[in-house]
Amino acid sequence: MHIKTLTVSQLNRYVKNTLDADFILNNASVKGEISNLKIHSSGHIYFSLKDGGSKINCVMFKSYAYNLKFAPENGMDVVALGNVSVYEKEGSYQLYVKDMKREGIGDLYVAFEKLKEKLKEEGLFDDVHKKEIPKFSKKVGVITSPTGAALKDIINVTKRRNKGIELLIYPALVQGTDSSKTLIEGIKTLNKVEDVDIIILARGGGSIEELWAFNNEELAYSVYNSKKPIITGVGHETDFTIVDFVSDRRAPTPSAAAEIAVFDREVLINEILNYKYNIKNSMENIIKEKRNYLNLYKQKIEANSPTNIIVNEYKNIDNLKELLNMKIEGKLNKEKNDLSRLSSLLEAHNPLNVLKKGYTLIEDEGNNLITEKEALKELNKINIIFKDGRAKLSIEYIEEF
């Protein structure tokens, strides 16, 4: 039988291809304890998984490590999901981890989802039950560990935003045995303090076990039944607990919870100054507008006052009088001109003017002008009119030409 000789690279590649083709090794779920943990600056995580008899090298690349819900540590028991393959360059096989959970955490997640679904069906998460967060709280109740970073963050935020706000701190256990009971007692106690306006329920980040006190059913009902609004600031932004769904407002961190509960004094002062400025401008504009209206109405009233009406009528009468005089004068001038023209025309046609040339006029005794000799046949006497007088004559005879 002829045995084919392989190079090292060919052998490693053959083993890799064989492992990659195996269904079980491509979907491996391996339980063990973390050791030799190294988190590279690139974001990749290198470690080993071991049990009592063996160990295997593991790598978790950055894209998968980003989605981890906990920070891995040496000595931590975990279940790693991934595929087994060969690193050809070294000829070593290792587990390429795509997801990883803490051993025993699965039961907690199941319990969390079960309680979450139960309370959701009961309506504890409905927005209609959410109480309004007061804008200007004077006293803020805080339920948290007296020694934790959460309290320091809340105090720092409060000092920065508004030193006049009073914090009433109820020291509570935030993890471990009986921690839920102290949180419940804190809610009951602060609800009895009349001048507490709002309650912050807070703690810093941690694993699901460390935050488990905030997944307590009795605590959820206590938050729901609180007469005072409650803001939760539990863990980090990616951490969600049952009380976050029940509370009146969920903040991603304790600091963010304080930002919501404590109004910023400087911002408020600036808003008040802006309102004052806007009100002043509005009032000035209104006064200016009303003053213009007033002046307009004043002018209308003055224009329609009896005195002004009489004065205006006198002015109108004077204007009409002046106009009438102008028209009369114009009419008289026209008549004078017409009379002068007619006088000149009449003078030009005055028969007496003809008498000045030596001619005479003959009238009968009735002063009727006689222009034909036939009219003399019936007359005995006639009047002769000269340029400077008249004479009465008797007709002795009539001679025809």
Curated annotation (Swiss-Prot):
Pfam families assigned to the protein according to its UniProt record, in alphabetical order: Exonuc_VII_L, tRNA_anti_2
Keywords of the record, alphabetical order, are:
Cytoplasm, Exonuclease, Hydrolase, Nuclease
Q: Which reaction does it catalyse?
A: Exonucleolytic cleavage in either 5'- to 3'- or 3'- to 5'-direction to yield nucleoside 5'-phosphates
Keyword check for Chaperone:
no
InterPro entries linked to this entry:
Exonuc_VII_L (IPR003753), Exonuc_VII_lsu_C (IPR020579), OB-fold_nuc-bd_dom (IPR025824)
What does the record give as EC number?
A: 3.1.11.6
Name the source's superkingdom: Bacteria
What is the enzyme's class at the highest EC level? Answer: hydrolase
Respond yes or no to whether keyword Hydrolase is given for this record: yes
Q: Which GO terms describe its cellular component?
A: cytoplasm; exodeoxyribonuclease VII complex
As for subcellular location, the record says: Cytoplasm
Q: Name one GO biological process term.
A: DNA catabolic process
| Assembly description | Heterooligomer composed of large and small subunits.
Q: What function does this protein fulfil?
A: Bidirectionally degrades single-stranded DNA into large acid-insoluble oligonucleotides, which are then degraded further into small acid-soluble oligonucleotides.
Q: What is this protein called?
A: Exodeoxyribonuclease 7 large subunit
Lineage of producing organism: Bacteria, Bacillati, Bacillota, Clostridia, Eubacteriales
